[in-house]
Amino acid sequence: MTNIRKTHPLIKIINHSFIDLPAPSNISTWWNFGSLLGFCLVTQILTGLFLAMHYTSDTMTAFSSVTHICRDVNYGWLIRYMHANGASMFFICLFLHVGRGMYYGSYIYFETWNIGVILLFVVMATAFMGYVLPWGQMSFWGATVITNLLSAIPYIGTTLVEWIWGGFSVDKATLTRFFAFHFILPFIIAALAMIHLLFLHETGSNNPSGLISDSDKIPFHPYYTIKDILGVLLLILILMILVLFSPDFLGDPDNYTPANPLSTPPHIKPEWYFLFAYAILRSIPNKLGGVLALIFSILILMLFPLLHLSKQRSMMFRPLSQCMFWILVADLITLTWIGGQPVEYPYVIIGQFASILYFTIILLILPIISLIENKLLKW
């Protein structure tokens, strides 16, 4: 009798995706982040579901409902902080996952890569709307500032913003619709993640060398299932240290003040994972220019397959490109720091320089270095 794992229509799909999947024998820990992102998504959906059972999306009661969750609901504080810090872990894994793809040339599988970039956009939108829900000062003003950016769109901008707001300012209608979208989007993310995997399994995984690994494949289970479980345990450890010892470490103290449309916080800034994009937005004095730079700072990832001019796929054997890649990482860390600083000298100048460097490295320097490396190897 044939194993049910290989014959049952549904179990067969799971088998081909997670058990009998041929995987390269040399993929490193950098390949763990896909499974970690899956784990983060499941955790966020579950904690979010339990939070939604007690949350009310009304401007009068939203803030107090979050307080009620933390004070009166059994382990409500744990669920709330796991959800808030889980988002940070999600973005850490996302950035490392994208960075891995850039370093090892995974973007050559352009269908998988482009779905991944769309996923990044949707996750960022979801996180932004989630940040608005507690209805603290930073929630309200963050929503006001970011939605207001759409007014930079010529001709239809103002109408579009008022349509999104559901009125003439961020108010009850805005909060209610943001809650509705924040609830539905994670399920859309899950569907997109399945498409992401579908495209990946069409080609098979890349590996650190960037070479074709068809001649040396091993089954995903038990080798990489064990490896992924180790990664998940480490993620849980870091998340729980954060949640249990310093749950507000990555948050903003302003969000413990209920939203007040009459009082603007001294420094309006988003969560840490948006600061790099926020710094790019602020570094351009023109509103429309800033918005375009903000969108393009993420959309530029879609150009990576077109900008790949090297004869080698991975950066593993390309020291010049490696050096430039790490300068890009340092530049992004600088942008993240600048995004959290007030708009004054010298931060403005540093932000503008770092923003120019970000686009220059990706669009100009990396492709040129690739050509130089080809020349050095007489290719």
Curated annotation (Swiss-Prot):
Asked whether the keyword Iron is assigned, the reply is: yes
The protein here is known as Cytochrome b
A single GO molecular-function term is: metal ion binding
Q: How does it assemble?
A: The cytochrome bc1 complex contains 11 subunits: 3 respiratory subunits (MT-CYB, CYC1 and UQCRFS1), 2 core proteins (UQCRC1 and UQCRC2) and 6 low-molecular weight proteins (UQCRH/QCR6, UQCRB/QCR7, UQCRQ/QCR8, UQCR10/QCR9, UQCR11/QCR10 and a cleavage product of UQCRFS1). This cytochrome bc1 complex then forms a dimer.
Please report the organism this UniProt entry assigns to the protein: Marmota baibacina (Gray marmot)
Question: Which cofactor is recorded for it?
Answer: heme b
Q: How does it sit in the membrane?
A: Multi-pass membrane protein
Query: What function is annotated for this protein?
Result: Component of the ubiquinol-cytochrome c reductase complex (complex III or cytochrome b-c1 complex) that is part of the mitochondrial respiratory chain. The b-c1 complex mediates electron transfer from ubiquinol to cytochrome c. Contributes to the generation of a proton gradient across the mitochondrial membrane that is then used for ATP synthesis.
- PROSITE patterns tied to this protein: CYTB_CTER, CYTB_NTER
Note the Pfam families from the entry. Answer: Cytochrom_B_C (PF00032), Cytochrome_B (PF00033)
The yes or no answer to whether the keyword Transport is present is yes
| Family classification | Belongs to the cytochrome b family.
Q: Which GO terms describe its cellular component?
A: mitochondrial inner membrane; respiratory chain complex III
Residues annotated as binding heme b b566 are H97, H196
The protein's location, in the record's own words, is: Mitochondrion inner membrane
Gene Ontology biological-process entries: mitochondrial electron transport, ubiquinol to cytochrome c
- Where does the sequence pass through the membrane? 33-53, 77-98, 113-133, 178-198, 226-246, 288-308, 320-340, 347-367
**Annotated InterPro entries:** Cyt_b/b6_C (IPR005798), Cyt_b/b6_C_sf (IPR036150), Cyt_b/b6_N (IPR005797), Cytb/b6-like_sf (IPR027387), Cytochrome_b (IPR030689), Cytochrome_b_C_euk/bac (IPR048260), Cytochrome_b_N_euk/bac (IPR048259), Di-haem_cyt_TM (IPR016174)
What taxonomic lineage is listed for the species of origin? Eukaryota, Metazoa, Chordata, Craniata, Vertebrata
Keywords per UniProt? Electron transport, Heme, Iron, Membrane, Metal-binding, Mitochondrion, Mitochondrion inner membrane, Respiratory chain, Transmembrane, Transmembrane helix, Transport, Ubiquinone
Q: Which CDD domains match?
A: cytochrome_b_C, Cytochrome_b_N
